[in-house]
Amino acid sequence: MIARRAFSVAVYARRGARVLVIEHRRLATWLPIGGELEAGETPLEAAARELREETGMAGEFRVLAGALDGVPPGLIGYEEHQAGSKGLHMNFVFVARVADDVDVTPNDEFGAWRWVTRRELDDLASPLNVRQFGYLALDADWA
């Protein structure tokens, strides 16, 4: 049995044919926006909060084409992995549409950010699942 579990979200902010990735200071890799759920928060609420807190942007989380009843708007996937002292890390992955005229407000959690295309995702120095979910975010079709 796993002693501890951590629930988190990842958010791919999408602007047309590009998604936002950040260079995470502590982990030294390119990732989507994200963080852990706070007490009483749903994954969707956490996704909206993390996007706002880490970038200053509001996202539009819409129901995706083909989504089943009860699936939160913008949910593109789920993954889990062992995360050291945090135990099992359970991560809900979302895509949110963001406005073209609003840019990222820098944050102390990341050193740099980029809006990347599918081709740029191919060469991104990041874990494979980050690129795979990035492709899903770019392919997401709003209902």
Question: Model regions: which residues?
Answer:
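Conserved N-terminal beta-strand and adjoining loop/helix that marks the start
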Residues: M1-V19, E36-A39, V93
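Short secondary-structure boundary/capping segments
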Residues: A3, V11, G84-K86, V104-P106
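A short beta-loop-beta micro-motif enriched in histidine and acidic residues
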Residues: F7-S8, E45, H89, D108-F110
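Short, charged/polar surface micro-motifs in flexible loops or helix N-caps
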Residues: R14-V19, L27-A28, E38, L68-P73, ...
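Conserved active-site beta-strand element of glycosyltransferases/polysaccharide synthases
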Residues: I22
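Nudix hydrolase/Nudix homology domain
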Residues: R25-W30, N91, V95-A143
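The catalytic Nudix box helix
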Residues: P32-L68
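Active-site segment of metal-dependent pyrophosphate-handling enzymes
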Residues: G56-D101
